[in-house]
Amino acid sequence: MTTLKLYLEDSDLSEATAKIVELINGEQGIIRLDRTIFHAQGGGQKSDIGLIDNILVTHASHSDNYVDHYVADFGNLEVGQEVNISIDLNNRLIHAKHHVAGHLIAALIEKRFPDLQATGGHHWPGQARVEFSGTLPPIEKVQESLKSDLAEAIFEDIPVQVKGDPYGSRKIAIGDFPAVSCGGTHPKSLGTLREVEVTKIKSQKGVLRVSYSVAN
């Protein structure tokens, strides 16, 4: 048995129905469903929050082939029951915007500075950053080019698309930039971002770290 992750196919899906397959007691209750729209924390992106019927889901995480939905209590929920599930759409959008902004920064820097390669990203609000390795250019040069390149890409409202099998070889493509493997959620185009600010660029021990924030 596995949880079908509907958000992999449609990041805009905010409501659905699902069947409860397991209830796990513990310090926090865990609800497992046959399918979900809740993005499980991972890949540098925070978890969705929302409701299973009227029960508040405060966190979602991967566990083997399941997505575990964390709750304070189960209320009257039972295994086998069909439930309505919904996510906090504003919360989803905040994290989707931060995630795609990280991809955009990686794509722009790799295009402008081919000797650099993105090696990781953390897309949490207030902590968002992308790290690169390779031949490090002057920080001032990166700062100047990235600011203008970000503004141009957002102004052009470049489309963001899912490529490949959403449940297999899923990739995210921003316009004509190379598609990258990703299991996160993203807006349909860059215009949603409005503004991405590069808050800090740091170079240390062969690693370039670009920290950023996204306008609400």
Residue ranges and their predicted role:
Residues 1-216:
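Active-/binding-site microenvironments in catalytic and ligand-binding cores
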